[in-house]
Design a protein with these regions (language model features):
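Active-site nucleophile/metal-coordination loop of metallo-enzymes that catalyze phosphate/sulfate
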Residues: 2-17, 23-128, 132-192, 196-204, ...
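Long, well-ordered, tryptophan-enriched scaffold segments
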Residues: 173-267, 274, 278, 284-289, ...
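Metal-dependent catalytic core segments for phosphate chemistry
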Residues: 357-418, 448
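Active-site regions of oxyanion-processing enzymes, predominantly non-cytosolic
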Residues: 12-14, 415-436
Length: 462
């Protein structure tokens, strides 16, 4: 029977893969008071575990292609999880590839990196190192930034022309751990005798991925203009925000106001990104650097056509050499230090497509790249027979603890519509973002509500 004529009541009903993002099992009963999943009323999940075949899989360290750190296996994340699920095998992650190249010395001969230094030397410009200063190992590695300082020293590049724009974390790290990471960075600066921190900003602004362009604009203007409060040191910028957050729900490193670091206004102006400079964005994960990278690199026509309109960036910077640690998105006009390895053969989406079967991928905006781009091994375009649906994530709140249901109902309805269709696909992959995105806010009450919403939606689909 043709896949297009098969329905859920046919001999070959669809297989539905439901990904409850951020949903896990904590084996330590002593921590139950901090476990939103344990505290939530989840009758559907309880029934599935009690009455249907159930297993647990490990999602960290070498089981998903990540290293073993000083404190044990490095935790997985949404990108890593979706790529491993889609591949059906352990996938060596970008973090490992880059770290190995540093250990072998190949990193310091990387052609794209050397070109960034050469360009700034030729124009008399500066090299700006931009990225997440954190040991979360989800988007970046502080050790990679220190290696870039080492590379600058090895090339003999003037230390006062190596400028660091530090993005603070607070999502994959403790909420106020940023001061400690900035201190660790300062030790790296001093040991190599090169570089200085010239701006600090929370990832809420510099690493948006939901087209909240007003956030990206605040980061961009801090990087290119005399915009934002000025502080004498990076630590002072973070501590000032801890003392006076912009909103009651915006605590910690994630939300640090884009801030200038310098002795005075003249010093600040001298350290902004300008014509003829080089920028090295050292984040290795691709989804969150895309928006601000586009603001720096797209020509005027492409910038005018970005989704949801972008912002008025003024005149595009001229003769800017922008280098990304990895390929954030195909078609971006940037130099790339570490290109993706050859695509894997036999991943799930390809196997389904090659068999002449159809598939449906669905998520809200926050997780749509995960069920498409990451699930398909960094493939932007759909496979033949792959249908996609994106449900907009809420934009009327600044943090999802204010709306823990997010857009789960819309995602559920999109799946139910396909299940009821005469041409229902043979494979449905759906992501519910709530557990992860609301959990990151640190609000127990909201996280419990998020889990209960997801459980109800899964029950409707089943």
């Amino acid at each position: 029977m043709s896949p297009k004529t098969e329905t859920p009541s046919s001999p070959h009903p669809p297989a539905v893969l439901v990904i409850r993002d951020g949903w896990g099992r904590n084996p330590h009963p002593a921590e139950a008071a901090f476990d939103a999943i344990r505290k939530a009323n989840t009758p559907v999940a309880d029934d599935l575990e009690a009455n249907w075949p159930t297993t647990l899989v490990r999602t960290s360290g070498e089981d998903v292609g990540l290293p073993i750190g000083a404190d044990g296996p490095v935790m997985g994340n949404s990108e890593v999880g979706h790529q491993n699920i889609g591949a059906g095998r352990i996938v060596d992650q970008e973090l490992m590839r880059i770290t190995r190249s540093i250990r072998s010395g190949e990193f310091f001969e990387n052609a794209a990196l050397l070109d960034a230094f050469a360009h700034a030397a030729e124009t008399g410009g500066r090299v700006h190192l931009l990225g997440l200063v954190s040991d979360g190992l989800v988007h970046s590695d502080l050790g990679h930034l220190v290696a870039l300082l080492d590379a600058a020293k090895r090339r003999g590049f003037p230390g006062d022309r190596v400028l660091i724009h530090a993005i603070t974390d607070g999502r994959d790290t403790p909420p106020t751990g940023g001061v400690g990471y900035l201190a660790e960075l300062q030790r790296g600066i001093e040991s190599h005798g090169t570089g200085r921190v010239v701006s600090v900003m929370g990832r809420f602004y510099a690493m948006d991925r939901d087209h909240r362009w007003e956030r990206v604009e605040a980061a961009y203007r801090c990087l290119t203009e005399r915009s934002g409060p000025r502080h004498d040191t990076a630590a002072a910028a973070a501590e000032a925000y801890y003392a006076e957050p912009s909103e009651a729900s915006r605590h910690g490193d994630e939300f640090v106001t884009p801030s200038q670091i310098g002795a005075d206004d003249a010093d600040v102006l001298e350290s902004r990104i300008r014509d003829g400079d080089s920028v090295v964005f050292f984040n290795f994960r691709g989804d969150r650097p895309r928006e601000i990278t586009k603001a720096f690199t797209l020509d005027d026509d492409a910038w005018a056509a970005v989704e949801r309109g972008g912002f008025d960036r003024g005149a595009r910077l001229r003769d800017l050499r922008f280098t990304a640690m990895t390929r954030y998105e195909s078609g971006l006009p940037v130099e790339v230090m570490f290109e993706k390895p050859p695509r894997m053969e036999g991943i799930l989406g390809a196997v389904v497509s090659d068999a002449g079967l159809t598939q449906f991928r669905c998520a809200e905006t926050e997780k749509f790249p995960h069920v498409t781009f990451f699930f398909n091994d960094y493939r932007e375009e759909p496979f033949p027979g792959e249908r996609r649906a994106i449900v907009p994530s809420p934009t009327d709140v600044s943090t999802y603890d204010q709306k823990p249901e997010m857009s789960a109902d819309g995602v559920m309805e999109a799946v139910l519509e396909r299940l009821a269709a005469d041409d229902c696909e043979r494979l449905i992959v759906v992501n519910f973002a709530n557990g992860d995105m609301v959990g990151h806010t640190g609000s127990m009450e909201a996280a419990v509500a998020a889990c209960e919403k997801v459980d109800a939606c899964v029950g409707r689909i089943i």
